[in-house]
A protein has these predicted regions:
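C-terminal edge-of-domain segments
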Residues: 83-148
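Ligand/cofactor pocket segment of small-molecule handling proteins
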Residues: 18
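N-terminal structural module
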Residues: 1-14
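A short, sequence-level motif marking secondary-structure junctions
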Residues: 4-5, 51-55, 107-109
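A generic structural motif
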Residues: 7-10, 54, 99-101
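Short amphipathic beta-strand/extended segments with alternating polar/hydrophobic composition
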Residues: 1, 48-51, 112-115
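A general marker of short, structured functional hotspots
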Residues: 12-13, 34, 61, 138
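Short, structured beta-strand-loop surface elements
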Residues: 23-97
Length: 148
């Protein structure tokens, strides 16, 4: 569902809105292991491994609710299932990060192209990105560190 990606615990827990009356809720109850992948326009990416749980806490839903979520639920015109923050179908999936891998360049498109061309001319392998593994211990430390 849309609505952005709210975060908790210094960004180590990601929240996604969901319709709790769907099969994915049953699937997560059976096997909570998930992997999320993200990529940006310059090809940098992140892969997050973790566990997911469905959360129906109304206060949490209300805190992150945006009216655009109605487009994903619809109004059943029964006075209850209206796509609002009070719609009982609306819940959240909390993904608790366990480990992550990311590939970051920090160079942008032109910097990457420059490195590829230089590699092609010199015969050296182009270094277009740095691969970073984030361990469970690092995630746990990140989760509990006070951020300014």
């Amino acid at each position: 569902m849309g609505g952005g990606t709210p975060q908790e615990n210094n960004g180590t827990d990601l929240l996604f809105f969901t319709n709790t009356h769907t099969h994915k809720v049953d699937e997560l109850a059976h096997d909570p292991h998930v992997n999320l992948s993200f990529v940006n326009a310059v090809g940098e990416w992140a892969s997050v491994a973790g566990s997911a749980a469905v959360v129906t806490d109304r206060e949490l839903v209300k805190r992150h609710y945006t009216p655009t979520l109605r487009a994903w639920l619809g109004d059943l015109e029964d006075g209850t299932h209206d796509g609002s923050e009070n719609d009982p179908r609306l819940g959240m999936i909390r993904v608790r990060m366990e480990t992550a891998t990311c590939s970051l360049s920090g160079k942008g498109v032109f910097g990457t192209v420059k490195d590829v061309v230089a590699g092609a001319v010199s015969g050296r392998v182009a270094c277009v990105a740095k691969l970073r593994e984030i361990s469970r211990a690092e995630v746990d430390l990140w989760r509990t560190t006070e951020m300014a």
